[in-house]
């Protein structure tokens, strides 16, 4: 971006200066509306989410057999909710900032099959595509026991079709593993940030991995191009897919059920704050949409990004969405949080969700490493760096009197609050890689 343009952008949006300086930044969204007001802009409804629930239920008997690790949950891919009181104390001590309310961790990091939040959206979209093809071919009805998809004739049928996706790692992992299991030929276009072990794991499942020297945007573009030349190839578009988004959104009702089981209340007197790491935006966007449908105006969602990849904060704050990238303002998009190394946000997610998000913040790689170490020490839970992005959120909210005043939160409401940090990945990180992460924390 030329200097004159850059100066006028900074004049209009002074916060951009802090982003360019790679400062850890918090922006509370002044454009937040009620759910009723913001929902029409999403372009999806409660019914769409119910359809996704129903589809995942139809596939549950298949998943329980195809992936024995899901048998105990009856083929439902869901993660545990954990209280992390020792980590809460550690954060308060390290940052000299009390966190009022209770801190919980949503362990999508340990979801079965692919060990990340992408096991929600990625697997869902592959299943939705397989169902569509099988229904159209007359091989399946909605009333069937879907475990029949494991038979050789279905494998044979699906092998005529292929799936392609561009990814920094975790989405590729979930789509690759699922597609290969169903019988699709699958190609994952991996950006320069992708970890070697993720590529190796995909190849071990018979997935074709194409590697790029450039970032996520290039991998997606190349994947899209390659798929266009083959009518039997389906491209899963992380930047624009409504199907992926709906796969994530199912988490809202599921969390509501987990809360009900624990007797945890979410209402005006007991607000819920949720902190979601954000890359291109599909995962956190879909989850936040589902949470809003489940808890209405009593849930407050925040997106967390690396200081080197603040694409969604930049896009929503300036209103330019996918018309601006972090590279345009001189930021390099290089971060240890490989799952969040995205320079240009999803325009679909930004425009759909900008009224339903309470805020955005950035944190440095070092902060993620520090918290990664503390969580391992205090709670014995090991995550990858990206998954710690949400952990900085509770301090930011508890430290901002102006945010609390705008929303009219009393001290008592904050004492009764639940702070939920969405841990997005790390359950499958190899031991030696994890030890390298742990060594970087202070």
Curated annotation (Swiss-Prot):
Co-factor(s): pyridoxal 5'-phosphate
Catalytic activity, EC: 4.3.1.18
Biological process per Gene Ontology, one example term: isoleucine biosynthetic process
InterPro entries: D_Ser_am_lyase, Ser/Thr_Dehydratase, Ser/Thr_deHydtase_PyrdxlP-BS, TrpB-like_PALP, TrpB-like_PALP_sf
UniProt keyword annotations, A-Z: Lyase, Pyridoxal phosphate
Annotated Pfam families: PALP
Membrane spanning residue stretches: none
Residues found modified as N6-(pyridoxal phosphate)lysine: 118
Record field: catalytic activity: D-serine = pyruvate + NH4(+)
SUPFAM superfamilies named in the record: Tryptophan synthase beta subunit-like PLP-dependent enzymes
GO molecular function per UniProt: D-serine ammonia-lyase activity; hydro-lyase activity; pyridoxal phosphate binding
CDD domains linked: D-Ser-dehyd
Domain of life: Bacteria
Family named by the database record: Belongs to the serine/threonine dehydratase family. DsdA subfamily.
Classification via NCBIfam families: D_Ser_am_lyase, PRK02991.1
Subunit structure: Monomer.
PANTHER family in UniProt: D-SERINE DEHYDRATASE, THREONINE DEHYDRATASE, MITOCHONDRIAL-RELATED
Protein name: D-serine dehydratase
Natural source organism: Escherichia fergusonii (strain ATCC 35469 / DSM 13698 / CCUG 18766 / IAM 14443 / JCM 21226 / LMG 7866 / NBRC 102419 / NCTC 12128 / CDC 0568-73)
Gene: dsdA
